[in-house]
Amino acid sequence: MLFLKAVIAILSVLPAADAAAILNFENKQGIIPDSYIVVLKNDISSDDFKSHVAWATGVHNANVAKRDVPLAGMQRTFEMDIFKGYSGAFDRATLDDLLKNEQVDYIEPDRMASAQGWTTQGNAPSWGLGRISHQQRGNTDYVFDSTAGRGITIYGVDSGIDILHAEFGGRATWGANFFNNINTDEFGHGTHTAATFGGTNYGVAKNVNIVAVKVLGDQGQGPWSSIIDGLQWAVNDAREKGILGKAIINFSVGGPSSRAADNALTAAHNAGVFVSAAAGNDGADALNYTPGTARSICVIGNINENDYRFTGNGASNWGTRIDLWAPGTDILSALPQGRYGPMTGTSMAAPHVAGSVAILMASGGVSTAEACGVLKDMSTPSVIEPGQGSTNRLLYNGSGQ
């Protein structure tokens, strides 16, 4: 790729002491040509960040004017506590100038990430609710605390949500769209995951408030830069509403490792928003992919109805980064336009945890920082053949059953 050759050429002439880190350009998976995410150093102030953005915009405009290069330049800015950066389409000269700037920590290529669920055929039963509320498999009743997550808000950072679906009982609202101007779920994945964590009939936490944050399109894909923007919006919305500590992000998205996305996820957690993240469906070590490479957040693997790690098409990732396992195979839930259907993937496992945390927050005042640990303490050692280095702990809501 031409942009990769340009980066190599730039690095060959930059003094090592002056160059910011430039990450993962040798891995071409999902790369969006000429598009970059630039992350600044942690100690930069908000005022200095604004000044830097203005400087970078000016540098780009001057460079493209000289060379008549049709690149968009600055497209998104990110400011989540100590995580500050921006994304855009920049030419070689601008990239050279950015790399030399002492405020820049690292630059990485923007890439496409994907929904982590796979649609399955058939009319599978919704067995997940019964499984997480019983210590033994095979039960169909769902036993849960009567608060059912009342007063807690879950942000579905996904493909959007069909907020008018009867499954949500008027509790779902449209938040923001960072992918296109079509404010609905074109893919189905976001509606399915939202109904799993918060649906009236198929959901874990039946009284939560649900907010749609669209970052993926009709093919279930979106750039990391859009996804980071969605994470930022969710955190800022929770802050503005005064619900930090009572807010959750369900993150059923994943893809090639992105340090910028990892840092944004960690920043969301540090701000007081719990993140339940799908481990990924590559049948590989979760540490090789985002969100598995992010720290602090809770990373969830997928089991089937017999308590085995799912190893079929779209096999669950595994490894030391898995915090918990949850039902994610043939999960029946809502789909757009009033429909219902099954899906399989770690995407379906993560919302079981998101909903369970909502109930813990509502009923017991569990904090963002301690929620994943509390669930691990409550979990049962039930998962069979979880994979090398993996925990065998299965999500359990402590119902006493």
UniProtKB/Swiss-Prot annotation:
Disulfide bonds: none
Keyword hit for RNA-binding: no
Active site: 158 (charge relay system), 189 (charge relay system), 347 (charge relay system)
InterPro entries: PCSK9_ProteinaseK-like, Peptidase_S8/S53_dom, Peptidase_S8/S53_dom_sf, Peptidase_S8_Ser-AS, Peptidase_S8_subtilisin-like, Peptidase_S8_subtilisin-rel, S8pro/Inhibitor_I9, S8pro/Inhibitor_I9_sf
Start and end residues of each Peptidase S8 domain: 126-401
GO CC annotations on file: extracellular region
Cellular compartment(s): Secreted
Prodomain residues: 20-116
Keywords: Glycoprotein, Hydrolase, Protease, Secreted, Serine protease, Signal, Virulence, Zymogen
N-terminal signal peptide: 1-19
PROSITE patterns, A to Z: SUBTILASE (PS51892), SUBTILASE_SER (PS00138)
Gene Ontology biological-process entries: proteolysis
Glycosylation site positions: 250, 397
EC number from the UniProt entry: 3.4.21.-
Keyword Kinase: no
GO molecular function, one term: serine-type endopeptidase activity
Sequence ranges assigned to domain Inhibitor I9 in this UniProt record: 35-112
Protein family (similarity comment): Belongs to the peptidase S8 family.
Purpose: Secreted subtilisin-like serine protease with keratinolytic activity that contributes to pathogenicity.
Protein name: Subtilisin-like protease 10
Organism this protein belongs to: Arthroderma otae (strain ATCC MYA-4605 / CBS 113480) (Microsporum canis)
Gene: SUB10
